[in-house]
Each structure stands twice: as structure tokens, then as C-alpha cells.
Amino acid sequence: MLKIAVPNKGSLSERAMEILAEAGYAGRGDSKSLNVFDEANNVEFFFLRPKDIAIYVAGGQLDLGITGRDLARDSQADVHEVLSLGFGSSTFRYAAPADEEWSIEKLDGKRIATSYPNLVRDDLAARGLSAEVLRLDGAVEVSIKLGVADAIADVVSTGRTLRQQGLAPFGEVLCTSEAVIVGRKDEKVTPEQQILLRRIQGILHAQNFLMLDYNVDRDNLDAATAVTPGLSGPTVSPLARDNWVAVRAMVPRRSANAIMDKLAGLGAEAILASEIRIARI
């Protein structure tokens, strides 16, 4: 039986549960449940604090876990990334009062508040800087106003919270983060784990592509299929209409409209784009 960790709350939890449900796994049901056994798939899901997940996986108590890259790195647990999930994107940066001039070198000898002390200490050590790192479990942005810290290091998504507190990020990004699946370091993925990973990959692939159908004159088929090569070649079927064929191919979601414009310019008709729910590619 697989034991999988999922964030117990927050934005990572919500999207992770959506993906798992789309992949055919049992939902949490009660938001206060600490674990759910999916008998049909022989998987037990444990709902844990995101910052603790990598530690449990590294210790062997759990097989895989969904967490943030920044949280996994800060935990210093012996895990590796098995799969990037493409949501929960953010950056980890230093920030200080917006009305002051700051550089990373100015952090030397200062007080830095953060919920990610190991990421900060590692970065400072790599730069040869020394500072007092204050660990806080939340509301890091207000620590400067309260006189606890001179600067902070925190996760930045939109930057709105920083601006509300009169802060601005400075220096380069310490870590670019997103939701990831982590496994124990130096341990191969098992066949049971591969089934779960393949299902999730199928959901992610489906989100990135659309299925495109259109009709085109055979005289323009080569030009049209050059625009829609698909993953391993488009499907081409004859139509009752003389010298015309129907074409079906997967296309990247981001460029679907531009592709449809090109097909229309080639004389293609009945150009339709449809969602792909699940895929195995």
C-alpha cells in the first residue's frame, strides 16, 4: 500500500486535492480528517503541514509527498523532486522598507525575520555574510513595523502583502518555488508509485493541450499538418466531400488560437478546439 502526504490546508492543498480527484483517487470528505484510505487504489493519504511533509518522506514513514519546493529545501530533508506540478508558483526573496535603499550586502549584521531560516542561513553563508536570523511561523511582513527585524525573507507571489506593509523586494531571487512531489533521496520510483505519477502526469498534460479538429482540402494537407504535427503525427480521415479530409491533432493550449488562425488562412473549415480531461502520453 502506498502512503502519500498531501498538504492539510492552504492553496497547495486545494489544487493538490483537485488533481488527485481528477486522477481517480478518493477525496478527503471531512476537512478535519488526518488521513483517508482509498481502498480501490490501495493508497492511504495523510494530510499534514506542508513544511513537515519532506521530513516524513525522508524518514521513510511516507512514500511520496506533495509540498512546495521552498519548504522541501528549507527542511533540509534527504528528498528529491520526482515531479513538478505546475501550480503554487512563487519566489523567495529578501524585502525591506520601500523608502530605504537596500542591497543584499547591507544585510550583514542585521536582523532578518523569516519562516524559512535554513534557506536564509545557507544563502547568507554562501555570500560570506553574518546576520541574526529570526524564525517566525507567520505574519513575517509585520515584523519590521513591530521592531523585531530590519528586513525579512519571505515567499512572494503577487507582492500585494509586501506593498500593504510598505515593503519592497530587493536582490536576486533565493528560490523559485512551485508544488512538487518529493520522494526519498537515492530511491527509485516503484511500480506502484509510477501508477500514481503517471495518472497525475496525464492530468498535467491534459491541462497543457487542446484537441483540434478541422477539415481541409488535400491540396493543403501538407501545409496544414505542418502547423498541427501533433505529438506523433495527426490523425487524417477521408471525408465524403471530394478531395477533403478531416484532421485531428493535439496542440499546445497557449498557441491554439494562433494555430487556428493559420489553418483558416489555409482554407481549413470547421476548426474546433476541445478540452482534454485525462491523457496518457
Swiss-Prot record:
* Assigned protein family: Belongs to the ATP phosphoribosyltransferase family. Long subfamily.
GO BP: L-histidine biosynthetic process
Q: Where in or outside the cell is it found?
A: Cytoplasm
Q: What is this protein called?
A: ATP phosphoribosyltransferase
- Name the needed cofactors: Mg(2+)
Q: According to its record, what are the GO cellular component terms? A: cytoplasm
Q: Which GO terms describe its molecular function?
A: ATP binding; ATP phosphoribosyltransferase activity; magnesium ion binding
Catalysed reaction(s) here are: 1-(5-phospho-beta-D-ribosyl)-ATP + diphosphate = 5-phospho-alpha-D-ribose 1-diphosphate + ATP
Job description of the protein: Catalyzes the condensation of ATP and 5-phosphoribose 1-diphosphate to form N'-(5'-phosphoribosyl)-ATP (PR-ATP). Has a crucial role in the pathway because the rate of histidine biosynthesis seems to be controlled primarily by regulation of HisG enzymatic activity.
**EC class of the enzyme, as a word:** transferase
Annotated HAMAP family? HisG_Long
Q: Which gene encodes it?
A: hisG
Extract the Pfam families matched here. HisG, HisG_C
Q: Which keywords has UniProt assigned to this entry?
A: Amino-acid biosynthesis, ATP-binding, Cytoplasm, Glycosyltransferase, Histidine biosynthesis, Magnesium, Metal-binding, Nucleotide-binding, Transferase
Which pathway is this protein assigned to? Amino-acid biosynthesis; L-histidine biosynthesis; L-histidine from 5-phospho-alpha-D-ribose 1-diphosphate: step 1/9
Recount the known activity regulation. Answer: Feedback inhibited by histidine.
Give the Enzyme Commission number. Answer: 2.4.2.17
